[in-house]
Amino acid sequence: MANKIRVRYAPSPTGLLHIGNARTALFNYLYARHHGGDFVIRIEDTDRKRHVEDGERSQLENLRWLGMDWDESPETHENYRQSERLELYQRYIDQLLAEGKAYKSYVTEEELAAERERQELAGETPRYINEFIGMSETEKEAYIAEREASGIIPTVRLAVNESGIYKWTDMVKGDIEFEGSNIGGDWVIQKKDGYPTYNFAVVIDDHDMQISHVIRGDDHIANTPKQLMVYEALGWEAPQFGHMTLIINSETGKKLSKRDTNTLQFIEDYRKKGYMSEAVFNFIALLGWNPGGEEEIFSREQLINLFDENRLSKSPAAFDQKKMDWMSNDYLKNADFESVFALCKPFLEEAGRLTDKAEKLVELYKPQLKSADEIVPLTDLFFADFPELTEAEKEVMAAETVPTVLSAFKEKLVSLSDEEFTRDTIFPQIKAVQKETGIKGKNLFMPIRIAVSGEMHGPELPDTIYLLGKEKSVQHIDNMLAKL
């Protein structure tokens, strides 16, 4: 095994980058960068049935968007896709066959299904029963000849040491062990189509690429003893394994499901909605790991410096969309204006709102944004029809002092010349209404805000009125007075 730390992220190109897989990549990336090691990308494309066109490109594009870089990948190195490594796998399969550590299996899918059904009806744990048990060499040869004559293409199975104990000290979960008798019998290492199975190919790849640490989700724990069997059969040292806990929905407490449409689970979704990649990176880094303390906002460089595998959580990581949005808002509020405007610009352009007011509108709503696509509904006031009032807003406007406040403020606005109507002159007009009417606080400000914007909350009121313009602000107040 290599002395230098080398980790890998090895996705299957079967679709978009899920947040769980992004976390796997990110923790491997942080671990490698913290220790001065190598971060390797390898594509595991042996499952041809689930292969998705452009799946590999999507994975790499989204990792790059998150801000990860890598040292080796199919983009720069040959044979970093499993489909390009079939000769290498065949070499080791032939070796195991020659050494009697693996054998060709001619049992059919129908026979396997029938045996599985029998075992289940008998209350037995389903497992493969070696088809050659009880056969003499002559009977075995006749069986193989008959099967091959029938056109049956064999698989290759690894001969499992049923009395073996397969254990490791997990980087996250501590000591774990499996008995060879509980693996399910001799298992397939090469399918009928000539492709290796995952648990075989991954061992060959990790050894060949000198991977020192395998950090992945704990859904892979059951795969680890099988992989240890391959390491043992080939006489190789296994890497260190670390299995991260599941990501669960913070509201239901259940495993995060791709069918849950209330949460954004694919990195592509965050890109399309205009989240800052730095915010998504920060959020994912805290799913099952924390550096200690109360602080939650970290730059990429800080996360690299702080990353400590000993602080990987043993408890499930809660995915909280509200926390993601809070964190995203914090990043957008504190980002430079040019970066935020660049994110908002495509959404404004698509909505036909890239006017001379666009920059001022983004500046106005920047503190409220959780994602850049929100700039369109937030600016409806300036482009769309006046919104219907909510019940809470109607209740505010039902107060007997509202007509007095609105009429007085309208008069103040009308009295201002175009030159006098500026952002800085609006607040003094509101204070003048307070002085004249004796109405103050929410009873003063809230009716004006609702009458002008149709909302109880929003940017600073003088900013909204100034950008809306005197004429339109007066028009909105007149319309509201007519409804009272």
UniProtKB/Swiss-Prot annotation:
What Pfam families does UniProt report for this protein, alphabetically?
Answer: Anticodon_2 (PF19269), tRNA-synt_1c (PF00749)
- Locate the motif 'KMSKS' region: 255-259
Q: Where does ATP bind?
A: 258
Q: Does the keyword Kinase apply?
A: no
Give yes or no: UniProt keyword Ligase: yes
Q: What is its EC number?
A: 6.1.1.17
Coiled-coil features, chain-numbered ranges: none
Q: Which GO terms describe its cellular component?
A: cytosol
Tell me which UniProt keywords the record has, alphabetically.
Answer: Aminoacyl-tRNA synthetase, ATP-binding, Cytoplasm, Ligase, Nucleotide-binding, Protein biosynthesis
Predominant location: cytoplasm
Q: What GO MF annotations does this protein's record show?
A: ATP binding; glutamate-tRNA ligase activity; tRNA binding; zinc ion binding
First and last residue of the signal peptide:
none
'HIGH' region: where is this motif?
11-21
**Catalytic activity annotated for this protein?**
tRNA(Glu) + L-glutamate + ATP = L-glutamyl-tRNA(Glu) + AMP + diphosphate
Q: Which GO BP terms, alphabetically?
A: glutamyl-tRNA aminoacylation
Q: Which InterPro entries match?
A: aa-tRNA-synth_I_cd-bd, aa-tRNA-synth_I_codon-bd_sub2, aa-tRNA-synth_I_CS, aa_tRNA-synth_I_cd-bd_sf, Glu-tRNA-ligase_bac/mito, Glu/Gln-tRNA-synth, Glu/Gln-tRNA-synth_Ib_cat-dom, GluQ/Sye
Its quaternary organisation is: Monomer.
Sum up the protein's function in the record's words.
Catalyzes the attachment of glutamate to tRNA(Glu) in a two-step reaction: glutamate is first activated by ATP to form Glu-AMP and then transferred to the acceptor end of tRNA(Glu).
Q: Which family does it belong to?
A: Belongs to the class-I aminoacyl-tRNA synthetase family. Glutamate--tRNA ligase type 1 subfamily.
What protein is this chain from? Glutamate--tRNA ligase
Gene name in the database record: gltX
